[in-house]
Amino acid sequence: LVRKVLNLPWKPAVILLFSVFANDWNLQDRLSPVGKLYDLPMVSVLDAVSPQFALKNDEGRVISKNQFFYDMFHPSNAGHSVMADCIEYLFERIDQAGHASLDAFEKGLTEEKILQENLNLAPVIGNSFENIRLLDKKDIYAKAYIDEGGFDSTDTQLQSVEMDDQLSLTPEFPYNWMYDGTKNTLNREKAYFELEMECRALLLVFKDSGEVNVGKAKVYVDGEYHFTADPHINNWQHCNAVIIFNNKTSENHVVRIEIAEEDRDKQFTILGFGYVL
């Protein structure tokens, strides 16, 4: 994702913000090498707040865990304010620092050229999905052959988020394919979705849900069973991306998503696909 953003033509600024879980852990040790390779500013909320959680008020504690966290993984409003303060502190430090890095001075290159050189180096984690594209009802790939079978409805009960500076909620993946066996009994006779295309990697994005009227779907590639997509494993409404295959070369494949026989009277939503040619 970082490489994808850094390669965008409008050259957006990138900051890596490492939040923290209630067990005083995050992924900064695993992911910070990405920031170091591309010389990106990084903010660690863990480093900012976790050391003071164990202190008493008269020892310098600023905020308690109960005040900072809304649940195990998400900050409260007060916690988000602390995170905003951390980012603001980063901007203050940047304003105080010189604009040219030592590397840029020693190499005689602009920071933009150094970044481009680093992007040409081997990635520290991977870049298998750097050029991934979305496939849904709106963003259709001309060489993808789709038989939607019984997936002829559109799900409107979707995970929604605030986008950019908008406070109103925007549904994610609105151009989806939904199988609805609760209303249309004819769908139960064609409880499948088929996609044929040539690509190197393919991801399925489906909707997780805790509703009782949601069922499972089995995923087949070229007639071979691969896995079952079960919305109840996570059991709350959100988007779940899973890898169907990730190969070294691009080949033609037929992917069939078939509603489990015992769940033909329920619903299942394909939010979209991600593909790499």
Where are these regions (language model features)?
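Glycan-recognition and processing domains
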Residues: 96-199, 203-210
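Extended, polar beta-sheet/loop recognition surfaces of beta-rich domains
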Residues: 264-277
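Alpha-helical cap/lid subdomain in secreted, periplasmic
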Residues: 1-104, 170, 177-203, 207-254, ...
